[in-house]
Amino acid sequence: MNEDMMTEAERASIAADGTDSLLGERGKGVFHIHTLGCQMNVHDSERIAGVLEANGYVPATEDQINDNDLDLLVLNTCAVRENAAERMYGTIGRFNRVKLVRPNLQIAVGGCMAQLDRKKIADTAPWVSAVFGTKNIEDLPKLLDQNRATGKAQVQVTEQLRQFPSQLPAARASRISSWVAISVGCNNTCTFCIVPTTRGKEKDRRPGDILDEIRQCVAGGAKEVTLLGQNVNSFGYGIGDRYAFSKLLRACGTIDGLERVRFTSPHPAAFTDDVIAAMAETPNIMHQLHFPLQSGSDRILRAMRRSYRSAKFLDILGRIREAMPDAQISTDIIVGFPGETEEDFQQTMDVVRQARFSSAFTFIYSPRPGTPAAAMEQIPRDVVQDRFDRLVALQEQITEENLATFEGRDVEVMITGKLGKKDTDTHRVTGREKTGVLVHIGVPEGEPVPEIGDFVTVTVTHAGRHNLLADPDVAAGQTYSVRH
């Protein structure tokens, strides 16, 4: 959700950097982190930044990034898609072009691809200074020091998690929205997924530690928190408490000043009525849900080792919407999984028609090395592309129809940014309403202009293909009000 992220310049302007006066304005070096992948990687990048700042490094401003006036570039990689390696090596190659004009530039590579390809990275890209994994973020400053001292690439990737990344210092990318990890890793064995290999088995944090972190975020100005985990609703299963996640959601409702709570991602097999009730009954839990379907074919779901079937999936959706009629539910769908027939694909299309997702992250299947599905017989690319195009067209139609239902309604939007370089002249702001839909707002003449983090109740005047527009006419009785 890039709209609620601060720029590097904003982050640099508010960072409490106690080391600058001791080390000079560049500290041990000016750094920039380039993040690929999911929300967990964004969370980890905040920890990487926090560890670096705690060790005397200084975050780059936008001007420094644009001018390549950098001492350290960090790439936090993703391994989920087939082109992950291509993206990683392509980015490392671009970093090397910067190093050619800044010979003292250090380049560090971390994240899931580093966890998988640690040695290959150092061999293929000898200009890389350090390689570190998902489980030893805290080692990065030491590796950089060793590289400076020896001139040799430092590769250190651990298989055992020594401490939760959430226990490390954080340089949060947003003043108002915070990522809070409740677990790391995954115990599922989906045949297409590389995450258990890169992140390991699921480990849950203590609920008290999670709630303490949330309170700290709120004390620092956060108004919204997103709880993160590969499978959030199996939280607590390891200690035998199958109600731990719903208890955590309800506990979030007791935190003063916490306006909005979201979470991602749940697994349909573990999504239970107590979680639905907690969402419906806790005022600051938003009625937004990312609910991965992957396929509407029971045969393909079995081949994927997804421990639910389409009927159960739709039944859960029905219970969610009965409890929360306004719920906006998005999903993930893989097209072209090995062995998928046209009949299987049509079953997916049927489920999409019934589910009426607010949006869908739709992917062409890509084999990941070492996963069971990679060894299965693959489907011709042209067949998969045709199916993909048909599914995207169907979902876009449903999305547009869903957004159209917002026209004329009043929604409360948390402001997360300004629109365009001339926003101070046009007074256009952007944010998300309670169920996560992006809303672009035109501030009526003479009305107060909201700041980032303010809440605006406004009448939606137009639905776009992927967002809503609100250009209210206050004189005609349409709504516009700001809450700080």
Curated annotation (Swiss-Prot):
SUPFAM superfamilies (alphabetical): Radical SAM enzymes (SSF102114)
Residues noted as binding [4Fe-4S] cluster 1 in the record, renumbered to the chain: C38, C78, C112
Species in which this protein is naturally found: Bifidobacterium longum subsp. infantis (strain ATCC 15697 / DSM 20088 / JCM 1222 / NCTC 11817 / S12)
Binding note for cofactor: Binds 2 [4Fe-4S] clusters. One cluster is coordinated with 3 cysteines and an exchangeable S-adenosyl-L-methionine.
Cofactor names: [4Fe-4S] cluster
Family of the protein in this entry: Belongs to the methylthiotransferase family. MiaB subfamily.
UniProt protein name: tRNA-2-methylthio-N(6)-dimethylallyladenosine synthase
GO CC terms: cytosol
PROSITE patterns: MTTASE_N (PS51449), MTTASE_RADICAL (PS01278), RADICAL_SAM (PS51918)
Annotated residues for binding of [4Fe-4S] cluster 2: C186, C190, C193
Catalyzed reactions: N(6)-dimethylallyladenosine(37) in tRNA + (sulfur carrier)-SH + AH2 + 2 S-adenosyl-L-methionine = 2-methylsulfanyl-N(6)-dimethylallyladenosine(37) in tRNA + (sulfur carrier)-H + 5'-deoxyadenosine + L-methionine + A + S-adenosyl-L-homocysteine + 2 H(+)
Function: Catalyzes the methylthiolation of N6-(dimethylallyl)adenosine (i(6)A), leading to the formation of 2-methylthio-N6-(dimethylallyl)adenosine (ms(2)i(6)A) at position 37 in tRNAs that read codons beginning with uridine.
Keywords: 4Fe-4S, Cytoplasm, Iron, Iron-sulfur, Metal-binding, S-adenosyl-L-methionine, Transferase, tRNA processing
PANTHER family referenced in this protein's UniProt entry, alphabetically: CDK5 REGULATORY SUBUNIT-ASSOCIATED PROTEIN 1, MITOCHONDRIAL TRNA METHYLTHIOTRANSFERASE CDK5RAP1
Residue ranges of every copy of the Radical SAM core domain listed in the record: 172-401
SMART domains: Elp3
Compartment(s): Cytoplasm
Residue span(s) of domain TRAM: 404-474
